[in-house]
Regions:
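Polysaccharide-binding surfaces and accessory modules of carbohydrate-active proteins
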Residues: 3-5, 9-14, 19, 42-51, ...
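Beta-strand-rich recognition/accessory modules
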Residues: 5-19, 26, 41-44, 87-92, ...
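Acidic-aromatic substrate-binding/catalytic surfaces of carbohydrate-active enzymes
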Residues: 9-89, 203-204, 337, 444-445
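Extended, loop-rich substrate-binding clefts of extracytoplasmic carbohydrate-active enzymes
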Residues: 54-112, 136-138, 197-207, 213, ...
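Surface-exposed binding patches on compact interaction domains or structured appendages
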Residues: 69-74, 277, 349-400, 413, ...
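Acidic, contiguous internal or C-terminal segments within carbohydrate-active enzymes
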Residues: 86-140, 497-523
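Catalytic domains of carbohydrate-active enzymes that cleave complex glycans
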Residues: 222-224, 231, 622-624, 630, ...
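Catalytic-core regions of glycoside hydrolase
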Residues: 542-774
């Protein structure tokens, strides 16, 4: 039965002989104070210590604590025990009951925390627990403070605001001047990663993320962790329940400084040093006592043979027997195991103590596929919506047939994948692929130049988006194809894109893809492309506004070794944008204020060029023009003259908070007065979005549709008014988004939802945002956490590299064209011939309920989406033919 005690309803402070802590039940048990009694300074930063939570914050479904109760228990005779209990309400946590116990042993300078989560609800929950500590190790947080931990890449001493998969189970903040440290130690079987907040001199916080668990009704999850405080160290190189340690190498000595949180007399340390080449140095044993407030120095004779990373391994013995460390937090061996670096090290990778950092890793999937080739090497076709993982294994079905068929409209690009994997025991090298012309037998052809072959590079994801899903390598970067190997333990995709120019005659086109490899006879894959007898709109029906910071893109281009001028790079972006039917704001935004604004507009028109002027679906007018009414009028007149006013807008504000709404309304009114033909708009989201009735355009976050405001948005869309929406780091699954580790269907279904809801525009904040210091080819994670938000195009020394997601987005824009042409033909046929035999079939095809029943419950099966697209495409052909008779 649950322990009973004295209920606390106000701030409470408890202390041992070495530390004190203060908390309040209304603050969810967060420690507002934590101090060494020998020092008056509070180690808790502004955000407090031991803030606990689950998952990722949502502005739509906030997590709440219910029935909060704090008690002082007297079940342990020699120490105070605080127990906090509460019930949870929110996404993935409803029905959870939380119990947290904090114990202060009298002769220790740390607090032991036992955190237990019980599912008292009726549904299983995906529980992603975390603990956050905002630390102020000295009198004030400043630039000298050190936040340290051990990642898979070794010691981290200068973190930013980012995640680190944990190779060891501790994190520490130290003031090297005052030599005070506050550190936390977690169960290494539970700790997945550490998120650090050291983006400026005023914050030093870390957040421990535990391995998420599926918690069934009636089941519990529990962990134990410790928060300790010590003095005497200028940094921390290792920490455990009982102590923190600093390692120094100088003058032929390796010195271990140990600051303890407990009292352990008559200890003997048996230590060794391990080099990367597995050379081992056994160090002479040292004897000492440890107790809180006392700094122990153990000096060993050892000089490094060279610069590099070394491991320090040690066992403590007491009375000749091992003195096991970290009994509470569950160290795998009860000893000391850490890394230190001498000079410059090229290899600092550190194997984790446990498999926890890899607990969410992708698992091989068995793919039932008909093989194109089934010999030493297996080759098969994959949908462009199936993100092929390197560990995926084909299970051949039936007899191999070297035939691939696709269908596409005139003016459309259609992709598919050729997947390669050697049979067990085989290795195939120097695989080369070429494509020939596709001919229709009547003198018409799709030339080989319209068939693009690209390799697919993978980007590693160590933290899943929103802590939901799996980790591992995800296919995304598309590069010009070079020869490649096929191995028995890895599947390799090749991305094939066929484009039918708008003037391509309808019909069936046939040709071959040739595959050559060392030690194998040449292979031919027969490719059939059916060109449907209708043409996509030259200017897409779906309006898009995707952000691009050309200055940042140019700097990134230079960083990867590019030599293009800014104008040449802009042309590369324009080419891929037009090929993918997307409008990039960085290319189509009108000039900023200028003394000769007419001249600036003329230069802008020349830079953009006639193709983009004709095909772009949006043109942004800079908000800063509002201070220059004459320039606004000139821009407005220019838009009218070029017949582009229906595509013009001005972004007045981005997701303004409620206190700013009055000012934003004034700005909207000013724009409508100055330039009635330029639509002012404001992006908005959350449970209280900014939705003024007289605003020309609404730009809402996608998840607003699932709130009470969704009814008003849908009403406005049904009236044919201008409604756009956007995604960014939100929404999470099960919604659609453009994130790296979302499935292809989850990337593409957004366009079908856009059509079904009557929304006519999609906005996206950036296509090539890279955080400072980040290598986009290795890591696309932000602190949300999400992977790939704001990056759809990769930098290249030759210009721009498309992503697999960029291709899927193009297909989604084309889907919207299909649906637009389908609806137009159906409406015209209904008016011309209400009893036409095609109309019942068209009505069935128009029913998208199975494909998109709502914003979250759509099937993830690529076949269902692709079959619906083909069904609609064929009906467009038939209905247009019927209308032409």
């Amino acid at each position: 039965s649950a322990a009973q005690g004295v209920v606390v309803d106000e701030e409470i402070e408890i202390q041992s002989n070495h530390v004190s802590l203060g908390t309040h039940p209304a603050e969810g048990g967060v420690l507002e104070s934590f101090s060494l009694l020998a020092s008056p300074d509070n180690l808790a930063g502004p955000g407090g210590l031991l803030e606990e939570g689950f998952g990722v914050f949502s502005p739509y479904l906030p997590n709440r604590r219910m029935n909060v109760q704090m008690e002082v228990l007297d079940e342990v005779a020699d120490r105070p025990v605080l127990q906090l209990t509460y019930d949870c309400e929110g996404p993935n946590i409803s029905g959870l009951h939380v119990t947290r116990r904090m114990e202060l042993a009298p002769e220790e300078s740390s607090v032991k925390v036992t955190w237990t989560v019980e599912n008292r609800g009726k549904e299983r929950q995906w529980v992603a627990p975390w603990v956050r500590c905002d630390v102020s190790a000295g009198a004030a947080t400043d630039a000298q403070d050190r936040l340290e931990l051990m990642s898979l890449d070794g010691k981290v001493s200068k973190p930013g605001r980012k995640y680190y998969p944990a190779s060891r189970n501790w994190a520490a903040v130290t003031d090297p001047t005052e030599k005070r440290s506050c550190y936390a130690v977690f169960n290494p079987d539970h700790l997945h990663a550490l998120l650090t907040f050291r983006g400026n001199d005023q914050e030093s916080a870390f957040q421990a993320h535990f391995v998420p668990v599926v918690l069934h009704p009636g089941k519990t999850w529990s962990t134990v962790y410790r928060l300790g405080a010590v003095a005497g160290l200028s940094r921390v190189d290792f920490a455990t329940d009982e102590m923190a340690m600093q390692l120094d190498v100088e003058d032929g000595k390796l010195r271990a400084l140990m600051a303890s949180t407990v009292q352990l007399p008559q200890l003997e340390i048996h230590a060794s040093v391990l080099a990367k080449n597995n050379r081992v140095w056994k160090l002479d044993p040292k004897k000492f006592d440890i107790l809180p407030g006392k700094l122990v120095r153990a000096s060993f004779d050892w000089a490094p043979p060279s610069d590099g990373a070394y491991e320090f391994l040690a066992e403590l013995r007491q009375g000749g027997k091992p003195a096991t460390l970290a009994r509470d937090t569950g160290s795998p061996h009860g000893g000391i195991d850490t890394q230190f670096v001498v000079g410059k090290a090229t290899d600092t990778k550190l194997e984790p103590w446990t498999g926890a950092p890899y607990a969410l890793e992708q698992q091989p999937r068995v793919l039932e596929r008909t093989m194109l080739v089934d010999d030493k090497m297996r080759v098969w076709k994959e949908s462009p919506l199936h993100k092929l993982l390197q560990g995926d294994v084909p299970d051949p079905q039936g007899t191999a047939r070297p035939e691939v068929s696709i269908s596409l409209a005139k003016g459309e690009a259609e992709s598919f994948q050729l997947a390669f994997r050697a049979k067990p025991g085989e290795e195939i090298f120097d695989i080369g692929i070429t494509a020939g012309n596709l001919d229709n037998g009547n003198g018409g052809s799709i030339p080989a130049s319209q068939i693009q072959l690209r390799s697919v590079d993978y980007v590693d994801s160590r933290i899943p988006s929103h802590y939901e899903g799996v980790t591992g390598k995800w296919p995304d970067v598309l590069r010009p194809l070079k020869s490649f190997p096929a191995l028995a333990n890895q599947s390799v995709p090749v991305w094939v894109t066929v484009t039918a120019p708008a003037d391509t005659p309808a019909g069936t086109y046939r040709g071959t893809i040739q595959i050559a490899a060392s030690g194998m006879d040449p292979i031919e894959i027969y490719l059939t492309a059916e060109v449907l007898n209708f043409t996509l709109l030259e200017r897409p029906a779906l309006r898009t506004d995707f952000g691009l910071d050309m200055e940042a893109a140019f700097q990134l281009h230079r960083k990867v070794g590019g030599v293009l001028s800014k104008e040449q790079l802009a042309q590369r972006f324009a080419e891929t944008a037009m090929a993918h039917r997307i409008t990039l704001r960085g290319l189509t935004q009108l000039p900023p204020p200028a003394n000769d604004y007419a001249g600036a507009l003329g230069k802008f028109e020349k830079q953009v060029g006639p193709d983009l002027l004709r095909r772009a679906t949006s043109f942004s007018v800079p908000q800063e023009l509002a201070a220059y009414p004459d320039m606004v009028k000139r821009a407005s007149l220019w838009m009218d003259t070029k017949r582009m006013a229906d595509r013009a807008f001005v972004q007045v504000a981005d997701e303004p908070e409620q206190p700013a709404w009055t000012k934003v309304l004034e700005q909207l009114t000013a724009w409508r007065t100055m330039a009635p033909n330029i639509a002012p708009r404001v992006s908005t989201g959350g449970l209280q979005p900014f939705l003024p009735i007289d605003q020309n355009t609404w730009l809402i976050h996608a998840q607003v549709l699932d709130t009470s405001n969704g009814v008003e948005v849908l009403k406005r869309a049904s009236e044919g008014k201008d409604v756009w929406w956007f995604v960014n780091h939100q929404p999470p699954r099960p919604y659609a988004n453009f994130l790296l580790d979302f499935s292809g269907v989850e990337n593409r279904i957004l366009f079908w939802q856009t059509w079904a809801l009557g929304i006519n525009g999609i906005s996206y904040w950036d296509v090539q945002y890279v955080e400072p210091g980040m290598d986009p080819f290795k890591n696309l994670l932000d602190i949300t956490p999400v992977n790939g938000d704001g990056l759809l195009l990769y930098p290249s020394k030759d210009g721009v590299l498309d992503s697999l997601r960029w291709e899927i987005i193009r297909d989604g824009v084309e889907d919207y064209d299909y649906l637009t042409l389908f609806a137009k033909a159906r409406k015209e046929l209904q008016a011309k011939s209400p009893a036409h035999a095609l109309l019942p079939r068209a009505a069935t095809a128009a029913n998208l309920e199975r494909l998109i029943p709502n914003l979250v419950a759509f099937p993830r099966d690529p076949d269902l989406l692709e079959n619906k697209r083909l069904e609609i495409g064929r009906l467009i052909v038939e209905m247009q033919a019927a209308l032409s008779k």
